[in-house]
Regions:
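Short, Lys/Arg-enriched N-terminal segments with co-localized hydrophobic residues
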Residues: 1-17
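Anion-binding alpha/beta catalytic cores of soluble intermediary-metabolism enzymes, centered on
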Residues: 17-281, 286-350
């Protein structure tokens, strides 16, 4: 996509309003949550904030010094946002105390906590969530995935029984009858480079929950491979097949099957030939890739070649919703991820 110039240069030139994200906006507006944006050093934050506040998608906290806010918010109306200066916040000591409490076994002192919070605003954002002053956080427009996730793992932790965080994209493919009328969850596309059978099974369960939460339909999870039902022999195939067994044992209420090639997972005619007795093949709507490489490449292929909407990466498995952005994101991508984070916060509060 080519950016248009001037004030709207952080939005896509041709923005197709898709039904999925409209439903997410509506859900977010119905029960507004407070989301922290720690990247006041990026103008896209303020372009997104203007739209979020104008449309009532979420309450916003923006972390930044007066200089950062003044420089990067020029031309944007962020009336209604709460601005928190990390160097002069009356609640700062509360967050320092919480940081030390959570990381005392790692030797974190109050001085170390203060320095880290002032140097990396994502730590500040996570502490605001931990202390109940915010419901979620979104970062990553100008920080790496690692820099976004690390504070969340250290301070917020994973949900009980969850061993690791994974990331999914909600894909909306135009003019497509596959999946749930063109809606899919793709995972893991963003986080975990060291997947094994146990972790893949966990990704399958988390992704099924995410699909049901965001799409409102029953998930059908395909564990993808270059083999269908043993058509090829390789340790990578065995890893996926073992993940299917683990998932079916641990999560019997979820429809999970594999290993399946992509065409067998999606196309009924191919499924009839390659996996005729499968409960998922030919109708999968949740795709679990066998590696981070495959997932990351796969979502980008569909996004670029099929002109699909790619909403995410949305993190799953954390105790509170914290989400990452692509450093190449547009402001409207930030708006979408904030809305999805708000919906996750609604679910977490139930």
């Amino acid at each position: 996509m080519i950016n248009i110039m001037c004030r709207n240069s952080y939005f896509k030139e041709e923005s197709v309003i898709m039904a999925f994200i409209d439903t997410i906006y509506a859900r977010a507006k119905a029960d507004k949550k407070t989301i922290v944006l720690p990247e006041s050093m990026d103008k896209r934050t303020f372009a997104a904030a203007e739209k979020i506040l104008k449309e009532g998608i979420a309450n916003l906290i923006i972390i930044g010094t007066p200089e950062e806010i003044a420089e990067n918010s020029k031309g944007y109306d962020i009336t209604g946002a709460t601005i928190v200066d990390p160097f002069n916040d009356p609640n700062k000591q509360k967050y320092i105390d919480k940081f030390v409490e959570l990381r005392a076994k790692k030797g974190v002192t109050p001085e170390m906590a203060k320095e880290q919070m002032e140097k990396d605003y994502m730590y500040y954002a996570c502490l605001m969530c931990k202390c109940g002053d915010a419901d979620g956080a979104v970062s990553g427009a100008c920080h790496s995935t690692g820099n976004t996730i690390r504070p969340a793992l250290q301070l917020l932790k994973t949900k009980p029984g969850i061993s690791s965080v994974s990331g999914f994209f909600l894909m909306e493919v135009p003019n497509c009858e596959l999946g749930e009328n063109g809606l899919f969850v793709f995972a893991d596309c963003a986080v975990n480079p060291d997947l094994d059978s146990e972790k893949l099974a966990e990704v399958a369960a988390l992704s099924a929950d995410s699909f049901k939460s965001f799409v409102g339909a029953e998930p059908k999870v395909a564990m993808l491979s270059f083999s269908s039902y043993g058509s090829a022999k390789h340790e990578r195939v065995t890893m996926v097949a073992d993940a299917v067994k683990i998932a079916n044992e641990k999560y019997p209420d979820i429809a999970v099957d594999g290993e399946l090639q992509l065409d067998a997972a999606l196309v009924p005619e191919v499924a009839a030939l390659k996996a005729p007795n499968s409960k998922v093949a030919g109708k999968a709507n949740t795709l679990v890739f066998p590696s981070l490489e495959a997932g990351n490449i796969g979502y980008k292929l569909v996004q670029r070649l099929a002109k699909a909407g790619a909403y995410g990466p949305v993190l799953q498995g954390l105790l509170m919703p914290v989400n990452d952005l692509s450093r190449g994101c547009f402001a409207e991508d930030i708006v979408g991820v904030v809305a999805m984070t708000a919906v996750q916060a609604q679910d977490a509060a139930k």
